From Swiss-Prot:
Its main location: membrane. It is a peripheral membrane protein. Keywords: ATP-binding, Cell inner membrane, Cell membrane, Membrane, Nucleotide-binding, Phosphate transport, Translocase, Transport. It catalyses: phosphate(out) + ATP + H2O = ADP + 2 phosphate(in) + H(+). This is Phosphate import ATP-binding protein PstB. SMART domains: AAA. One of its GO terms (molecular function) is ATP hydrolysis activity. It comes from Bacteroides thetaiotaomicron (strain ATCC 29148 / DSM 2079 / JCM 5827 / CCUG 10774 / NCTC 10582 / VPI-5482 / E50). The complex is composed of two ATP-binding proteins (PstB), two transmembrane proteins (PstC and PstA) and a solute-binding protein (PstS).
């Protein structure tokens, strides 16, 4: 029996009066990769950001329903949002390194969380840069600015930065859309490696990418989750006509 990592129950979400997500229930298994696909404005990124409460930062939003991670309701009273975001890391569409050295970009989260043991920090920086398949490219220039890295290297640095505080879930919002094909391939290879240790949820407009990297795929349209199934089934034999129309390019 696969362990359920993320469990959402009848999730509805509003921006002001706009009903952005409508009755979404799904389960995401531990150490799997789930892709969210669908046209722009369908709600997939909004849903992703609920998993580490990023939408809390937007005024006049409202959530109904439950989102549980490891069995705990992450919107219950008393939940420490900082602790949640340590456990549920986020990688954004455009690489966003801090104006610091490569080393300090990765060490930042550890320092913010009160880690003062420099030997541990050095070890963790090396471990996560290796985990993000970046160590061999940067090990001799850790003191240089992160801005000196290529876009693809910066994105892998941001993945390492998210990994440094030992999350169990990684959220990726279009992580390769701003990258060239070679850098995109490296990020996709990395996702395959990371699922040994992490539960990964990725939003992508690139359906070929969803087909390559994910175990399951959810298709969103107009704020609803139309279909959620094994990726192979979604792309070869979907049950819903809307899913078929989207993956064959008839709309979107």
């Amino acid at each position: 029996m696969d362990t359920v990592k993320i469990d959402t129950r009848d999730v509805n979400f509003w921006y002001g009066d706009f009903h952005a997500l409508k009755g979404i229930s799904m389960q995401i298994e531990e150490k799997s990769v789930v892709a969210f696909i669908g046209p722009s404005g369908c709600g997939k990124s909004t849903f992703l950001r609920l998993f580490n409460r990023m939408n809390d930062l937007i005024p006049a939003t409202r959530l109904e329903g439950e989102i549980r991670i490891d069995g705990h309701n992450i919107y219950a009273k008393g939940v420490e949002v900082d602790e949640l975001r340590k456990n549920v890391g986020m990688v954004f569409q455009r690489p966003n390194p801090f104006p610091k050295s490569i080393f300090e970009n990765v060490a930042y989260g550890l320092r913010v969380n009160g880690v003062k043991d420099n030997a541990f920090i050095r070890q963790r920086v090396e471990e996560t840069l290796k985990g993000a398949a970046l160590w061999d490219e940067v090990k001799d220039k850790l003191k240089e600015s992160a801005y000196a890295l290529s876009g693809g290297q910066q994105q892998r640095l941001c993945i390492a930065r998210a990994m440094a505080v030992s999350p169990s879930v990684l959220l990726m919002d279009e992580p390769a859309s701003a990258l060239d094909p070679i850098s995109t391939a490296k990020v996709e290879e990395l996702i395959h490696e990371l699922k040994k240790d992490y539960t990964i949820v990725i939003v992508t407009h690139n359906m070929q990418q969803a087909a390559r990297v994910s175990d399951k795929t959810a298709f969103f349209y107009l704020g609803e989750m139309v279909e959620y199934d094994d990726t192979k089934k979604i792309f070869t034999n979907p049950e819903k006509e809307a899913t078929q129309n989207y993956i064959t390019g008839r709309f979107g």
